[in-house]
């Protein structure tokens, strides 16, 4: 039997041998968020070896710990750096996971409360949607206004041509 994606982040109070209410509800909310299933397991994050990102790490950890307050106050966050591979997407994933873990007991599972949008995929989906129906673009369009938390991942990773940008 595969290990539950919540195993390291669960007190096992909402399950028995045959079912887990929390896993079912969190799984449904994660699916609605469009976060790929391979990212449902909470990953550990550490600071750089030299500690250069310690203050940013502490700030993001504090936001994660107080994610309900952060979202309810309508705060925004833009994670950026000069390079890749330094944890921006990992932190964005952790924040989506934290929010869903915060709201799952009260959520009625009829609204998409968080969205994880891979920006280049979304832009391509919008282009594709001109010639034929694109389910990814339509889903985001239909749920963007109701989501309390929206992550635009890799927003600056791929620059389009001048033609693409001006369309």
Give each language-model segment a name.
Residues 1-69:
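A short, basic N-terminal segment
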Residues 70-93:
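Walker A/P-loop nucleotide-binding motif
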Residues 124-167:
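Conserved nucleotide-sensing/catalytic segment adjacent to the nucleotide-binding pocket
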Residues 70-71, 106-109, 142-145:
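Conserved catalytic network of the ASCE P-loop NTPase/AAA+ motor domain
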Residues 47, 118, 153:
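Conserved RecA-like P-loop NTPase ATPase core
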Residues 111, 116-126:
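A short hydrophobic beta-strand->loop->alpha-helix junction that borders the nucleotide-binding pocket
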Residues 97-114:
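Post-Walker A helix-loop "phosphate-sensing" segment adjacent to the P-loop in P-loop NTPases
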Residues 74-78, 113-114, 149:
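Residue-level preference for the first positions of well-ordered beta-strands
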């Amino acid at each position: 039997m595969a290990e539950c994606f919540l195993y390291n982040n669960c007190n096992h109070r909402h399950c028995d041998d045959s079912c887990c209410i929390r896993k079912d509800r969190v799984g449904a909310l994660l699916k609605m968020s469009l976060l790929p299933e391979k990212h449902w397991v909470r990953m550990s994050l550490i600071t750089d070896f030299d500690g250069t990102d310690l203050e940013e790490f502490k700030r993001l950890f504090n936001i994660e710990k107080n994610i309900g307050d952060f979202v309810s106050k309508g705060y925004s966050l833009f994670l950026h750096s000069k390079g890749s591979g330094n944890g921006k997407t990992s932190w964005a994933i952790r924040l989506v996971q934290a929010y869903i873990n915060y709201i799952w007991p009260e959520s009625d599972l009829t609204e998409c409360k968080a969205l994880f949008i891979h920006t280049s995929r979304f832009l391509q989906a919008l282009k594709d949607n001109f010639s034929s129906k694109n389910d990814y673009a339509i889903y985001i369009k239909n749920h963007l206004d109701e989501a309390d938390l929206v992550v635009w991942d890799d927003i600056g990773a791929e620059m389009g041509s001048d033609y693409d940008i001006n369309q």
